[in-house]
From Swiss-Prot:
Name recorded for this polypeptide: Orotidine 5'-phosphate decarboxylase
Gene Ontology biological-process entries: 'de novo' pyrimidine nucleobase biosynthetic process; 'de novo' UMP biosynthetic process
Molecular-function annotations in GO: orotidine-5'-phosphate decarboxylase activity
Enzyme Commission numbers on file: 4.1.1.23
Binding site for substrate: 12, 34, 61-70, 125, 187, 196, 216-217
Family, per entry: Belongs to the OMP decarboxylase family. Type 1 subfamily.
Pfam families assigned: OMPdecase
Subunit structure: Homodimer.
Position of the signal peptide: none
SMART domains (alphabetical): OMPdecase
EC top class, as a word: lyase
Active site (UniProt): 63 (proton donor)
InterPro entries, alphabetized: Aldolase_TIM, OMPdecase, OMPdecase_AS, OMPdecase_bac, OMPdeCOase_dom, RibuloseP-bd_barrel
Source organism per UniProt: Heliobacterium modesticaldum (strain ATCC 51547 / Ice1)
Length: 243
C-alpha cells in the first residue's frame, strides 16, 4: 500500500455540500474518507452512498456501543452499504465485539463482495491520563488500557483498532504486524493541535507502525486542501521509508 492509500481524510463538517467539496478537492490525494457522527447525523447515509458512488472508499466512524444484538444488526446494515471500515467501542465487551464481526460478515455475504473492517475504539485521543483516572474511573495508564482493549478486540475477531500515535508500538508488540491500527491525533508541525491530547506528526506515526492515519482540520481547514493533503502524504512516505 502506498502512502496516499493510507491517508483517511475526516469529513467533520455539517453539510453534504461541504463534504463533497472536500472530496472533490482531495480525492486523488488520499485513500479513504471518514464519515463520522457530525456529518452522518446531518446528511444521513445519502452522503456516504454519494461518496461511494464517486468511487471513493468510506470509513464510517459511528462508534457503535450498545447491547450485542443491536450492535450486530447495525453492523449488518453498514456492511450492506459497502463501507470499507466501521467502528465499535471496545468497552462494550467481548460479546458485543463478536456480534459486530458476525454482523459484518452477514452483511458481506448478502453483498457477495469484500466486507468491511471492524475497528475497535480503545481510548479516545482527547482523553488524557487525568481524565481516564479522575472522570472515567479506569485504573492503570492510558497505554495499559489501550493495549488491554486491543487484545480484547483481537480475541473477539476484530481486525483492528483506532488508537492514538503514542500507543502504536505497544499495540504492535501485543497484537502483531497484521493487526490494523488506524491513528487519529496526527498533526504536521505546520498545523495546530486542536482538541487532541495525544498527538504526533504524520512521519513519526507511520514510522511507529500505523496502518492508516486520520487527518481532518490540517487538510479541510487549509487554504489549499489539495496541497495540504499532498504535504501530509509526503511526510507519511518519509515515515514509511524509515520503518
Amino acid at each position: 500500500m502506498e502512502a496516499k492509500d493510507r491517508l483517511i481524510v475526516a469529513l467533520d463538517v455539517d453539510t453534504r455540500d461541504e463534504a463533497i467539496s472536500i472530496v472533490n478537492a482531495v480525492g486523488e490525494h488520499c485513500g479513504l474518507f471518514k464519515v463520522g457522527m457530525q456529518l452522518h447525523n446531518s446528511a444521513g447515509f445519502a452522503v456516504t452512498e454519494e461518496i461511494l458512488s464517486m468511487g471513493f472508499p468510506v470509513f464510517l466512524d459511528l462508534k457503535f456501543h450498545d447491547i450485542p444484538n443491536t450492535v450486530g444488526k447495525a453492523a449488518t446494515v453498514v456492511s450492506r452499504r459497502g463501507v470499507k471500515m466501521f467502528t465499535v467501542h471496545a468497552a462494550g465487551g467481548r460479546e458485543m465485539l463478536r456480534q459486530a464481526v458476525k454482523g459484518a460478515r452477514e452483511g458481506q455475504g448478502e453483498r457477495r463482495s469484500g466486507g468491511p473492517l471492524v475497528l475497535a475504539i480503545t481510548v479516545l485521543t482527547s482523553v488524557s491520563q487525568a481524565v481516564l483516572h479522575d472522570e472515567v474511573g479506569l485504573p492503570g495508564s492510558v497505554e495499559e488500557n489501550v493495549v488491554r482493549f486491543a487484545r480484547l478486540a483481537q480475541a473477539a475477531g476484530v481486525q483492528g483498532v483506532v488508537a492514538s500515535p503514542q500507543e502504536i508500538r505497544p499495540i504492535r508488540a501485543a497484537c502483531g504486524d497484521d493487526f490494523v491500527i488506524v491513528t487519529p491525533g496526527v498533526r504536521p508541525l505546520w498545523a495546530g493541535t486542536d482538541d487532541q491530547a495525544r498527538i504526533m506528526t504524520p512521519a513519526k506515526a507511520m514510522e511507529a507502525g500505523a496502518t492508516y492515519l486520520v487527518v481532518g482540520r490540517p487538510i479541510t481547514a487549509a487554504p489549499s486542501r489539495a496541497e495540504a493533503a499532498k504535504r501530509i502524504v509526503e511526510e507519511m512516505a518519509e515515515g514509511l521509508a524509515r520503518r
